[in-house]
Design a protein with these regions (language model features):
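Short glycine-rich, Thr/Ser-proximal phosphate-binding strand/loop in the N-terminal lobe
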Residues: 52-73
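Single conserved hydrophobic/aromatic residue that forms the stacking wall/gate
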Residues: 1, 215, 219-228
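Conserved phosphate-handling catalytic cores of large alpha/beta enzymes
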Residues: 73-82, 89, 93, 100-201
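Extended, charged alpha/beta regions that create polyanion-binding interfaces
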Residues: 2-32
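Well-ordered alpha-helical segments embedded in enzymatic catalytic cores
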Residues: 17, 21, 77-84
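C-terminal extensions
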Residues: 195-214
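Residue-level signature of catalytic and energy-coupling elements of molecular machines
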Residues: 40, 94, 160, 216
Length: 228
């Protein structure tokens, strides 16, 4: 009995920590009024770039190959291509995903930005769950014409702009902020994380001009919002 009691207490503590970490992630300050370039790093398949405007609308998608094993010609072309997209769309911030090839990509971006004549900053963004989102039904509906990796770059850019609006599209268990998540009660964990997401959204509120269309909003309500 004592062992079961200790296990239950440990489970509750792990679930509570997961919930608190998720809340902190969801309630990060948004970055308003900036054009952001999402940079999804990779080696062999190239780095995916996505430019989104101040409202999160996708303006441009591109792939560059700044890292080996790409050919010398491709690596040489990556810098000018990156600077061109920065200038063409007057990008304010670069959001670099923290996955594979992140460190090399950070060095590449920092070096290229030295040649840009205005202030453009970069930041490393936690991309946990971006691949889950980009392969999801929600992402396919939102971006039917984009490849999975291109959707990831968009998600990385938007996470910097509005973490809450982007992260609510992903199963909370996929954002990688918990411990022992597969060892605890999945039902209790799901209930706690759903509660955290709901309270975070209620605390911040929803901008219907930019919020994702959700299935639990009825068609008449949606049409009413649009006509209003």
């Amino acid at each position: 009995y004592k062992r079961q009691e200790l296990t239950e207490k440990a489970d509750e503590q792990a679930i509570a920590i997961f919930g608190e970490n998720l809340r902190n992630l969801l309630l990060q300050s948004p970055l308003k009024g900036k054009v952001v370039l999402g940079f999804d790093p990779a080696y062999r398949t190239g780095c995916k770039l996505a430019v989104v405007d101040e409202t999160g609308k996708v303006l441009a998608i591109q792939v560059i190959y700044p890292h080996k094993p790409a050919t010398a010609a491709k690596r040489e072309a990556a810098g000018p291509a990156f600077k061109k997209i920065i200038e063409d769309y007057q990008v304010d911030m670069v959001a670099i995903g923290n996955g594979t090839a992140s460190r090399e990509s950070e060095l590449f971006v920092a070096e290229q930005l030295k040649a840009v004549k205005r202030d453009v900053f970069y930041v490393i963004v936690n991309e946990a769950g971006a691949s889950v989102y980009s392969a999801s039904e929600v992402a396919r509906k939102e971006f039917p014409d984009l490849q999975v990796e291109e959707r990831s770059a968009v998600s990385i850019a938007r996470r910097l702009q509005d973490p809450l609006a982007e992260l609510v599209k992903i199963d909370p268990k996929a954002v990688g902020v918990g411990q022992y998540q597969h060892d605890v009660s999945q039902k209790r964990l799901a209930e706690q994380l759903d509660f955290v997401v709901e309270t975070a959204v209620n605390q911040v509120g929803v901008d219907v001009n930019t919020a994702l269309s959700l299935i639990h909003i009825s068609e008449p309500t949606r049409l009413g919002m649009i006509s209003y």
